[in-house]
Amino acid sequence: MADRFSRFNEDRDFQGNHFDQYEEGHLEIEQASLDKPIESDNIGHRLLQKHGWKLGQGLGKSLQGRTDPIPIVVKYDVMGMGRMEMELDYAEDATERRRVLEVEKEDTEELRQKYKDYVDKEKAIAKALEDLRANFYCELCDKQYQKHQEFDNHINSYDHAHKQRLKDLKQREFARNVSSRSRKDEKKQEKALRRLHELAEQRKQAECAPGSGPMFRPTTVAVDEDGGEEDKDESSTNSGASAVSSCGFGADFSTDKGGSFTSVQITNTTGLSQAPGLASQGISFGIKNNLGPPLQKLGVSFSFAKKAPVKLESIASVFKDHAEEGSSEDGTKADEKSSDQGVQKVGDTDGTGNLDGKKEDEDPQDGGSLASTLSKLKRMKREEGTGATEPEYYHYIPPAHCKVKPNFPFLLFMRASEQMEGDHSAHSKSAPENRKSSSPKPQGCSKTAASPGAERTVSEASELQKEAAVAGPSEPGGKTETKKGSGGGEDEQSVESRETSESPMCESNPKDISQATPATKAGQGPKHPTGPFFPVLSKDESTALQWPSELLIFTKAEPSISYSCNPLYFDFKLSRNKDAKAKGTEKPKDVAGSSKDHLQSLDPREPNKSQEEEQDVVLSSEGRVDEPASGAACSSLNKQEPGGSHMSETEDTGRSHPSKKEPSGKSHRHKKKKKHKKSSKHKRKHKADTEEKSSKAESGEKSKKRKKRKRKKNKSSAAADSERGPKSEPPGSGSPAPPRRRRRAQDDSQRRSLPAEEGNSGKKDDGGGGSSCQDHSGRKHKGEPPTSSCQRRANTKHSSRSSHRSQPSSGDEDSDDASSHRLHQKSPSQYSEEEEEEEEEEEEEDEDSGSEHSRSRSRSGHRHSSHRSSRRSYSSSSDASSDQSCYSRQHSYSDDSYSDYSDRSRRHSKRSHDSDDSDYTSSKHRSKRHKYSSSDDDYSLSCSQSRSRSRSHTRERSRSRGRSRSSSCSRSRSKRRSRSTTAHSWQRSRSYSRDRSRSTRSPSQRSGSRKGSWGHESPEERRSGRRDFIRSKIYRSQSPHYFQSGRGEGPGKKEDGRGDDSKGAGLPSQNSNTGTGRGSESDCSPEDKNSVTARLLLEKIQSRKVERKPNVCEEVLATPNKAGLKYKNPPQGYFGPKLPPSLGNKPVLPMIGKLPATRKSNKKCEESGLERGEEQEHSEPEEGSPRSSDAPFGHQFSEEAAGPLSDPPPEEPKSEEATADHSVAPLGTPAHTDCYPGDPAISHNYLPDPSDGDTLESLDSGSQPGPVESSLLPIAPDLEHFPNYAPPSGEPSIESTDGTEDASLAPLESQPITFTPEEMEKYSKLQQAAQQHIQQQLLAKQVKAFPASTALAPATPALQPIHIQQPATASATSITTVQHAILQHHAAAAAAAIGIHPHPHPQPLAQVHHIPQPHLTPISLSHLTHSIIPGHPATFLASHPIHIIPASAIHPGPFTFHPVPHAALYPTLLAPRPAAAAATALHLHPLLHPIFSGQDLQHPPSHGT
């Protein structure tokens, strides 16, 4: 019976009443009750009886207990025991109180008084307490103590004493800083003034230096105050006065001191006319006379952003006229500061350009540059005035969001006739950074200036001025330029331009150029003032300020709207450094076409970028001075400069004819430009998007651009060298600068190096070679994705100039350009050989300089390719132009990518490459160039394709290295090349090549480039490539450049470095770098930085881990970075309609289970890419392929992740032609696939979108979307390879797939999943979580999370990478294919999970992967797609079927791929395989995302699927 009442059966109701619950079977439930006596059967009853108790007796000693039950009355008191009493008490109290209150009412007065007294007393007490407490309050520590003891203890405490000491210290420090700052400011102003005067004097002298052209164009508007005012007035009134004032820059720079800058009225009339053989017009009138008639007086008003009033005032004063002087006392200060800045800038540039800038290199550089800018601006204004058009001006105050305060303190909107617009264009060119070159005319003018070769945009002039200002004193720079120019007619012209630009008389030079340009630039639209200063009408319209041309950006709109930034805010050094970054980023914005867009784009970023771009542009413009080079340079500028829109147009026009004739010169300048083009590239891209879309003469434009770019690079080298020189070597390298210039002249490689240094601020200035290269790379990556591609080409070209590349990158670049020129002139085989040689040199150099050299070399190859294909590299340069249209950008990217790859390819096989280039040029130019700046697009596509190709090559090489890498690579490249011959094929092959290159940039690029003769991949190349790649990777990961350039172009740069190191692999790296790196640099700079840091660590670890792996890792890393970074601000159309609008800013997640989150993706990509690369490398080596094979494959995978994205460029071309939107998406999508596995929808959108190219280019140029696309593009080509990929042996397959890519890749490419940064973040987190949980909950999580992940986009990227796997693998050897397949398998798994492949692709992965179909059993995710990725079925619909290669196929078997049941593969991808499925589902698959080293390829096939 005991169990009957077991307590555990007792339940209590909510009121606490308990009910005994008996288990079943206890039918007689006995309720013990106190109401009745205990029954006999009760336990207690029996117990009591045992004790002698008898029923009826009371308990107790004397039986006194009651016998009857105790009646229990349960009192359910609602309030509990005693509660009622309490309540009643309360009630009574309340009643009493109420009574009291009633009494109170009666006794009101008395009570009130009492109450009042009481209150007063309370208050007094409180006050006394407060007073007392106030004594115990420590203000220093912000602590209130209640007791004296507490307070005393505190006062005597260490905490308090420490705070006191800290405070005192801070105060002292602050006082010191303030005093030192004020002193510094004073000194700076004095220096600036001094510099301005010096510059003015130099300009005067420079006028007398016809040899160098006005070596020292009056950068500063230093004219008598009367003259200055007169000048301004003249600018307003007549062109004649304008010319004089422009030359003289009559506007005095009033300093804060109230003194006006000593007007060194340098009559630029002579100086300008003295521009080396430019025009005899001399002064600004050169442009004015040319542009003067058409240039109506454009009223330009500068709206000053609401920044520091002093700064604005300073600016106002800097540009204010003498008339404005009194009113601009603050302006005087600003003027002084601005002048100082201008001087500094000029000095910087000049220092770079010449020894003259040595002193100015530091502050005066900025000041000098500013001064030159001011001079140009003033001149422009004067010319504007000369135009005598009613001053119509728009004030634009940069949006609050404009982060680039220095860049756009205000905008000058010049609304005037084409004439002024032309002037503006020139200025825009000069100041593309600041002024968005929305107006085609300005750009045209600027470009035109470059185009005629005679006209140098003001920016160019300004840059040149700065550079020349430095170079002018030491004509060596000019001579160097001349020497360089002597190298080739175009080069000579470039030199001429450069010299002119270099000379402080840049002002006159631009004018001369303008004059010379008229013919070339005849139909180029408005001529923007090319003087150092542009006369800008102040808001009151009474004063014409001399605005630094560099700060002016002219829109291409009929009424040229000039954007300008406060020169004081215009950090020319920064501008140059950031020019590359911002330029690329903002170019796309520029393409947006709206000045506002540009402003916004430029404003936040362009200020620095603009400044840099401006200088770059100046260089570019200078480069444009050459008539032949002018076109290319112009084109380069066009794409490079924010004001590149009009420039792009002009460049397109000018470049089309001069392009061919001056491939070398242009290339040379273009190379230089390429550097600057980094930032400008995006701008230019957008411009090109708008302008170059219809630019049939893309080749010419490209060439021009190249030339200009070269020039720009030269100038930029000099300027940037000076600029960055201060960082690496004092900008005082005015003396070094000319040598550098000389070196540049001597070696384009050095030129490239210099721009690199510029880009990297001498981060890697450790050695002229590697450091410069790295710098170049960094710069490239930083702001000049397009430039990057150009540089890449330059590097590729410079591959032929490898040894030079060891020299400063800037010189390297120039050298590359020159080399490109030479190579271009050479027979393809010669070119190839030279490129090969140089590539090998570069390889060695790359080994030395790692990423930078690699990049340089890669670029050199690209540039070679570019030059060979009508300056395809400059097409990349056109990136800014390509901002003209995403599509254009796509085209540009393809071109550039192709160039990248092509250069390598050319190194491999010139003829094939040439055909590729031609094909690309025709097809790509047709579809892309016109779509968006050919240069940019070329770059984008080129990067992508080159990367694909490189990647393919890398894969091939990986395999080749493992097995017959060289042959395979060669074959793949050959095939790719031959494919490239066809536009689509070419694009695809390029995309793929780029993909591949990206993947295998290190091995493949080297291999590819080195294989200038297709099969010519020397063991040294391979070894060097591998070593370089590893080294590059390690170096990059360890070097600040890795972060700087590895950040923006960081991954790309890194990859480029390693890619350049190993040309084959380097190409993807480079392209990836350029494509993504730039994107990352510009767009995801911080994110990329983090990613780069993470990647750096990972790379360091894994590079140590797997020295071979570095290729893969780096590629992978670079790809994620690129991919992630690139999409930061891709044009909307880039991704196409499908691409989510935010995709532009969305980091791209590698679709291949690269598992890169945006930045984290990048990081993860890096990690996973590295690890995956490791895995693949492990696997591949296990399979019998060397690390190179593995690394390339790893890269390929990562790059495949990015590669297929890159691959899409080929598809993109076809799509481009067919559907701009769709084509772009494929291009971008593959990249996205690489970078954004997370967003299937995005990936698809990205891939098919015609904007893809743009985005790529944008990524590349703008926010470096191009690089991202590069990253992505490589994936696309791989993916594209899927369809047409017949599984030849890896390479050929890739080649064929390359061709097929164009047609087939689009779907897959379109599928690549792009994610917004949020998505990427989510994806990265998801991936991390997944990876962490994958092994724990592989099946459950994979199955459950796989779709979720896919939805999140982690899985999809993994899946998509699988398609990527096809082309890359096909291109690569079987192992690479297998690895690619594995990677793609992961991608496919992710895609399968994500449903990336809505429709099985006609050509199964096996074709691409060259893996037995059983292994690649295509996993058609079309069914999965919708369920997994419900959001974007279309995204996946276009994607190729996910061909998953079973891990067994990819894993250590001798490359024999054991057929794995589709179910095995697919399920493995999805969920069946615990680790693999989970990893795949989460994109954390070790293979896909070797983030966890432990998960290296060692993962069993199950994992490897």
Swiss-Prot record:
InterPro entries per record: G_patch_dom, ZnF-G_patch_domain, Znf_C2H2_sf, Znf_C2H2_type
Chain intervals for the UniProt region annotation (Disordered): 166-244, 322-393, 419-537, 575-1304
Residues where Phosphoserine is found: 648, 733, 735, 753, 915, 918, 985, 1013, 1018, 1037, 1039, 1085, 1179
Pfam family, one: G-patch
Gene Ontology molecular function: mRNA binding; zinc ion binding
Zinc finger (C2H2-type): 136-160
Protein name, UniProt field: G patch domain-containing protein 8
SMART domains: G_patch
Organism placement in taxonomy: Eukaryota, Metazoa, Chordata, Craniata, Vertebrata
UniProt KW keywords: Acetylation, Coiled coil, Isopeptide bond, Metal-binding, Phosphoprotein, Ubl conjugation, Zinc, Zinc-finger
SUPFAM superfamilies, alphabetized: beta-beta-alpha zinc fingers
PANTHER family: G PATCH DOMAIN-CONTAINING PROTEIN 8, ZINC FINGER-CONTAINING
Organism: Mus musculus (Mouse)
